[in-house]
Structure formats: structure tokens, C-alpha cells
Regions:
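Conserved acetyl-CoA-binding loop-helix of GNAT-fold acetyltransferases
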Residues: 51-59, 176-181, 185-202, 221-225
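A conserved beta-strand-loop-helix scaffold within acyl/acetyltransferase catalytic domains
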Residues: 139-180
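Short amphipathic alpha-helix that is part of the acyltransferase structural core
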Residues: 1-9, 37, 42, 97-102, ...
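Conserved GNAT acetyl-CoA-binding A-motif
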Residues: 65-75, 200-211
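Acyl-donor-binding surface of acyltransferase catalytic domains
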Residues: 47-123, 237-238
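N-terminal charged segments
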Residues: 1-65, 80
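Conserved beta-strand-loop-alpha-helix junction that forms the acyl-donor binding cleft
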Residues: 71-79, 181, 210-220, 237-242
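Active-site rim helix/loop that mediates acceptor-substrate recognition in acyltransferases
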Residues: 8, 13-15, 61, 78, ...
């Protein structure tokens, strides 16, 4: 089984922050608060300094970007144990869910009606980001990974399904899968996944990965039907006050 941290890094590279800084193999990320993944420190491997010092650097970076300090760590891994020993706690208040399942599965394909575009359309933005006028942070995170495709299903002039696809190494990273309410339960989500899989296979991908909150039962059920299984989980951790004071000027 591939180490969880390798897959974590591949998923993170598919979701680039506006600003990033490396400390050893830890990656500090900031993107104006748009998504937990792009605004936390991905703590994998060795930061190259003692963990206590690394966490101080996490705090300094977050505060300098107007963020609350937070770490993304593989569940039950050595980093979590180090965090707990230093007074950090799982961020149970995280709006989208602090515990996330990383699923892996087959590419699938071909699609029936879904297609992959080279540029996002207004309809894609509306479904995937909830707006046709994305913020600078939304646009950066969602459109600057190296190999990107924007999946859509259209009914006339209306975009009724959308998904984001990114290829990193041999992994297709799928995100922002959305279907308009009136068009759900018609197989569009599966068709979007198939289109993404066929597109990614032509670009060297051999498998698919995605990240889903463990609280999102409908999404987990869909992906399990499509042959996905859980590879590992990660959690968001935050310092218990006053372990991480804001020292920024």
C-alpha cells in the first residue's frame, strides 16, 4: 500500500494555495480562507527542525496571512501523536468537517453526455464555486494546478453538472463534483466521473483519488458504488489556547 503521506502530497499539489512555504517536507499554505486544504499546514514527513519549533513556524505563517493556525495530518500517524503531545486538538468546529476520508478507485469511463473542457465556463463556476465571479483565491486554487480539466453536463444552455479534474503524477484528483438539484438521481455524477477518468487516462493517470468529509454520507455512498475504497483519513488540528499566540505586528 502506498504511504498515506505520498498520496496526501499528490492531492495537495492538485489543490495549490495562493501562497506556500516549505519547511522540510511540511507545506504551509494560505489562500484567503478558501477551503481548509489550501489554508493549513500539510504536516507530512520531517520538517527538518524539532516539532515544537515547526509548530511555532506554522503559527507565525498563519498569523502573517490573517489565518487561524491549523495543521492537516494523517489520522493516527506520527504527526498526530506529536500534535497531541504538544497541546494541539482536532478542530471539531471546522465547518466542512474536521475528519476527511481519502478514497482511491478506478478511473472509469467512457462518458455518455459529460465532457471535459480546457477552461472553466460561467456555468461551471456557478456549480463548483457557487458564483460566476470567483475571488482571486478561488480562481487560483481551482485553476492553477498543472494538468486541469473542467467537466460539465449541459441541458440546452444550462450547465446542470460539473466537476474539477487534476492529474498529478499517475493520480487523477477529483473535486467539486456538483449536480443541479432538479437533475439529481439521473446518473450525471457517475457520468462526470467517467468523463474525468477517460480524460485523465489519456494524460497518464492510472487511478483516481478524492477527499470527502466523513459526514458526507451521500457522497461516500456514490463513490463506494463506483468502486472506491478508503485509503486513509486526515484531520485538521488547531492549538489549544494559549499555545499559539498571535505575535504578528
Amino acid at each position: 500500500v502506498e504511504p498515506a503521506e505520498t498520496l496526501e502530497l499528490q492531492c495537495a499539489l492538485a489543490w495549490p494555495p495562493v501562497t506556500g512555504r516549505w519547511l522540510g517536507t511540511w507545506w504551509f499554505r494560505a489562500a484567503g480562507g478558501f477551503t481548509g486544504r489550501a489554508n493549513t499546514a500539510l504536516a507530512i514527513g520531517d520538517p527538518g527542525v524539532p516539532v515544537t519549533e515547526a509548530l511555532e513556524r506554522v503559527c507565525e505563517f498563519a498569523h502573517s496571512h490573517g489565518l487561524e493556525p491549523a495543521v492537516q495530518a494523517v489520522q493516527h500517524g506520527p504527526v498526530e501523536r506529536a500534535l497531541a503531545a504538544r497541546g494541539w486538538v482536532p478542530n471539531v468546529a471546522h465547518e466542512a468537517g474536521h475528519e476527511v476520508s481519502v478514497l482511491v478507485g478506478p478511473l472509469g469511463g467512457p462518458a455518455e453526455t459529460a465532457r471535459i473542457l480546457g477552461e472553466p465556463t460561467p456555468g461551471w463556476w456557478e456549480l463548483c464555486a457557487g458564483t460566476t465571479e470567483p475571488s482571486e483565491a478561488q480562481r487560483h486554487v481551482l485553476t492553477t494546478a498543472p494538468a486541469l480539466g473542467y467537466g460539465v453536463v449541459e441541458a440546452g444552455t444550462e450547465t446542470v453538472g460539473a466537476v474539477r479534474a487534476a492529474v498529478v503524477d499517475d493520480v487523477l484528483h477529483v473535486s467539486r463534483l456538483a449536480v443541479a438539484p432538479a437533475y439529481r438521481r439521473k446518473g450525471l455524477a457517475a457520468d462526470l466521473m467517467a468523463a474525468a477518468g477517460a480524460w485523465a487516462g489519456a494524460r497518464g493517470a492510472t487511478r483516481c483519488a478524492l477527499q470527502v468529509s466523513v459526514a458526507n454520507a451521500p457522497a461516500l455512498a456514490l463513490y463506494h458504488r463506483l468502486g472506491f475504497t478508503e485509503h486513509h483519513r486526515y484531520r485538521y488540528w488547531v492549538p489549544a489556547t494559549p499555545a499559539c499566540e498571535d505575535r504578528s505586528p
